[in-house]
Amino acid sequence: MCERAARLCRAGAHRLLREPPPQGRALGGLLRWVGARMGEPRAPLVPDIPAADPDPGPAAPRGGTAVILDIFRRADKNDDGKLSLEEFQLFFADGVLNEKELEGLFHTIDSDNTNHVDTKELCDYFVEHMGDYEDVLASLETLNHSVLKAMGYTKKVYEGGNNVDQFVTRFLLKETANQIQSLLSSVESAVEAIEEQTSQIRQDHCKPSPGVNESRYGGPTPPYIPNHKLVVPEPVKSLPVAIGEPKEEGLEVQISRLAELIGRLESKTLSFDLQQRLSDEEGTNMYLQLVRQEMAVCPEQLGEFLDSLRQYLRSTAEERNCFHVAAVRMADGLTFVIYEFWETEEEWKRHLQSPVCKAFRHVKVDTLSQPEALSQISVPAAWCTSGRD
């Protein structure tokens, strides 16, 4: 009897274990849990707010900043990390803004009133005024990096590639140059149009007058970097000023002193035969503009400077309104003086905006060891008509 009862108990237990739990009981428990949760007081929902970054880090630099900063570093001739008013005027003078306007711009950028503008402060000012040029300068940064990378690839192909690889690389290189040149031509056309307008403005406001003139002119950037400083050397300041119709005796004194001065500077006599272009009977201007540039060149940049100087002299000599141009190399081998005779001061200022003059200025920014000294003076045209000795 006991054994049978035990078997029945075990069979019942196994049956209960095999049967699934009653569905109604489970569903009822779930409904009771949901009802209890719905009856609880509920706090209003608040959207998740991302936690504040304790250290967001510096903001990403604006596009094109690296290009502008690199250009302005070149204006810092003494590499002290800041620009003085003199360096600022030297770099940015373009013949349109006068010295007073440039000084006002300098103090506007010099927000901390230290009488110096650091290159970052200068860069920040121009970045805020870049407009659509931000994308252009940012693209130049990328283009510069890509071109350098492509040049490395070209070298690698030409050192170890087959003829087909070299052909493809050569084709792509030429097409790249053509595309870049096409873009450059468009930009240069815009520059020339603007320069033509500004040249007309200068013609309306500038009137040539005989005598000694001291002023600042220049042409950056960026692509053309200004680098002119018009500082009259001490010997020129001692020359008498010719105003109006001087007496014949005073004119002779001026001619003698001017000839002596240039003779000392060049260690030789300048002589020109310009009678055919300077006839008083034709009402030709009685004065010429003599422009003198003195430049000290860095020894390691001498070759580049000489190549650019030769090109500048050839091109300037071909200009119709330039009567004569000559360059003299001083005894130290690193100092050069250029003399230019122009029909009028306006013609010389127009020459400052020519492509050859801008290209020469661009080279001077990189090759000169100090700012150039430049002076101009009106000289009697009759002095240039003497024959060669």
Swiss-Prot record:
Q: What residues bear Omega-N-methylarginine in this entry?
A: 10
A Pfam family found in this protein is: ABM
Please give the Gene3D superfamilies that the UniProt record associates with this protein: 3.30.70.100, EF-hand (1.10.238.10)
Query: Any idea where the ABM domain is?
Result: 289-377
| Record-level Gene Ontology MF annotations | A2A adenosine receptor binding; calcium ion binding; type 5 metabotropic glutamate receptor binding
Protein's UniProt keywords contain Calcium:
yes
Record field: transmembrane = none
Q: Which domain of life is it from?
A: Eukaryota
Cellular localization per UniProt: Cytoplasm; Cell projection, Dendrite; Cell projection, Axon; Cell membrane
Q: Which residues carry this modification: Asymmetric dimethylarginine?
A: 42
Q: Which residues form the EF-hand domain?
A: 63-98, 99-132
Q: Which UniProt keywords apply?
A: Calcium, Cell membrane, Cell projection, Coiled coil, Cytoplasm, Membrane, Metal-binding, Methylation, Repeat
Question: Which residues are listed for Ca(2+) 2 binding in this entry?
Answer: 110, 112, 114, 116, 121
Residues annotated to bind Ca(2+) 1: 76, 78, 80, 82, 87
Summary of the tissues where the protein is detected: Expressed in the striatum; predominantly in the caudate putamen. Expressed in hippocampus; particularly strong in the CA1 area. Expressed in the spinal dorsal horn with especially strong expression in lamina IIi; found in excitory synaptic boutons (at protein level).
Question: Among the entry's GO cellular component annotations, what is one?
Answer: axon
Q: Which spans of this chain does the record mark as coiled coil?
A: 173-198
GO term, biological process aspect, one? positive regulation of protein localization to membrane
Q: What does this protein do?
A: May act as a signaling scaffold protein that senses intracellular calcium. Can modulate ligand-induced internalization of ADORA2A and coupling efficiency of mGluR5/GRM5; for both receptors may regulate signaling activity such as promoting MAPK1/3 (ERK1/2) activation.
Subunit details for this protein?
A: Interacts (calcium-dependent) with ADORA2A and GRM5.
Please report the name of this protein according to its UniProt entry. Answer: N-terminal EF-hand calcium-binding protein 2
- Taxonomic placement: Eukaryota, Metazoa, Chordata, Craniata, Vertebrata
